[in-house]
Swiss-Prot record:
It comes from Penicillium rubens (strain ATCC 28089 / DSM 1075 / NRRL 1951 / Wisconsin 54-1255). One of its GO terms (cellular component) is mitochondrion. Residues 148-367 form the Radical SAM core domain. Gene3D superfamilies: Aldolase class I. The keyword Acetylation does not apply. Its main location: mitochondrion. It is found in: Mitochondrion. This is Lipoyl synthase, mitochondrial.
Length: 416
């Protein structure tokens, strides 16, 4: 009987060591709660309420839930207040940094519509990629969220989702040795587009410097497949620079497409700091020039990002060089930093400035200019004005079908 006695003594000593004010409220062997003598498990009528914290005071002083849901602002803000940039302190205590918050005019809704989910399902089923997703485009809810597929625009990204270049503004994955091309991609792309009652489609791609032709023949084959399935479809190709090989740019231009697009991205002075070292402003100019010379009636198009630190003089010079090679369409959009690993935003350009540059571009003789904070190179590419211009040019030229046949024969011969 000595062992139980020692155990009880040990328990008694342990209880005293913890706190002399603790009281065990149940026999040994039963689970129980230990409380201090000065407190009680139940509130007495005379117990005072806990004093409100500073956090509660801030909540009570702020807007109500109904104000939060409705936005709290019934009257529109004046331009000076609407365009004002706000800052916030972020980070752990002692290491907080001041960051500029995203302006109100750059905020977009989260995509969740049924049409968005339907388009995404179709693309996944055919193993296709879109630049809308890979480049985290802020307009995806607008372009994919129409009430039906005919009002939607999806920019198909050919040749996989991995690029061989690493531009400092782009969030697309990079690798020196991306996966090989999918030989069924041109047919799958044409099949996906035929399912949607679209009148205009945009094809783009990652840069494939690992391929001899840079993927030019893959582009041409995809355009040919689409035109075979739906000749009335208007096709825009947003290509890379093919390492400056103007013959490959001309090959794509002759494939039967309607708009040849290649983005210079920024002004010439900032190109070495923004784009991959293998890309130059003059190389892009030569690509656009070769496409126009290959098919003079072809609409050529490019895009520039603002907010990277460019000056007005540099923008003027870039536009003059683009007009010198007869580029028809130019777009301006705000650069938005995809992640902290990418180059920082130098300036958030206001909508008024975008409108000013739109007017300047039109005054210089550009056929069309889309300019705004959320505008991207393929955003609303098939607007009625461009579609009407393309249809008029197509009606006035009888060479479109012959060009497609000639390019198809050239592509087949090169493949063999």
């Amino acid at each position: 009987m000595a062992a139980p006695t020692r155990s009880l003594r040990r328990l008694s000593s342990f209880r005293t060591t913890i706190s002399p004010s603790l009281t065990v409220t149940a026999p040994i062997g039963c689970r129980s709660y230990a409380t201090t003598d000065s407190s009680s498990a139940t509130n007495t009528p005379g117990t005072t309420r806990r004093r409100a914290t500073k956090f509660q005071d801030k909540l009570n002083a702020g807007p109500s839930f109904s104000d939060f849901v409705s936005g709290g602002q019934d009257e529109p803000l004046d331009p000076s207040e609407a365009y004002a940039l706000k800052t916030a302190l972020v980070g752990p205590a002692g290491r907080k940094k001041e960051m500029t918050r995203l302006p109100e005019w750059l905020k977009t809704p989260i995509p969740d519509s049924k049409n968005y989910q339907r388009l995404k399902k179709d693309l996944r089923g055919l193993n296709l990629h879109t630049v809308c997703e890979e480049a985290r485009c802020p307009n995806i809810s607008d372009c994919w969220g129409g009430s039906d597929k005919s009002s939607a625009t999806a920019t198909i990204m050919l040749m996989g989702d991995t690029c061989t270049r690493g531009c400092r503004f782009c969030s697309v994955k990079t690798s020196r040795a991306p996966p090989p091309l999918d030989p069924h991609e041109p047919e799958n792309t044409a099949e996906a587009i035929s399912r949607w009652s679209l009148g205009y489609v945009v094809l783009t791609s990652v840069d494939r410097d690992d391929l001899v032709d840079g993927g030019a023949r893959h582009f041409a084959e995809t355009v040919i497949k689409i035109k075979q399935k739906k000749p009335s479809m208007l096709v825009e190709c947003l290509t890379g620079d093919f390492r400056g090989d103007t013959e490959m740019a001309a090959l794509v231009a002759r494939s039967g497409l309607d708009v040849y697009a290649h983005n210079v991205e920024t002004v010439e002075e900032l190109t070495p700091f923004v784009r991959d070292r293998r890309a130059t402003f003059q190389q892009s100019i030569r690509v656009l020039d070769s496409a126009k010379k290959a098919v003079p009636e072809l609409v050529t198009k490019t895009s520039l990002m603002l907010g990277l630190g460019e000056t007005d003089e540099q923008l003027w010079d870039a536009l003059r060089q683009l007009r010198a090679v007869n580029v028809d369409v130019v777009t301006f959009g705000q650069y938005m930093r995809p992640t902290k690993r990418h180059m920082a935003v130098h300036e958030y350009v206001t909508p008024d400035r975008f409108e000013l540059w739109r007017q300047r571009a039109l005054d210089m003789g550009f056929l069309y200019c889309a300019s705004g904070p959320l505008v991207r190179s393929s955003y609303k590419a098939g607007e009625a004005f461009i579609e009407n211009v393309l249809k008029k040019r197509r009606a006035g030229s009888g060479t479109a079908e012959r060009t497609v046949d000639q390019t198809a024969a050239t592509t087949d011969e090169a493949t063999r």
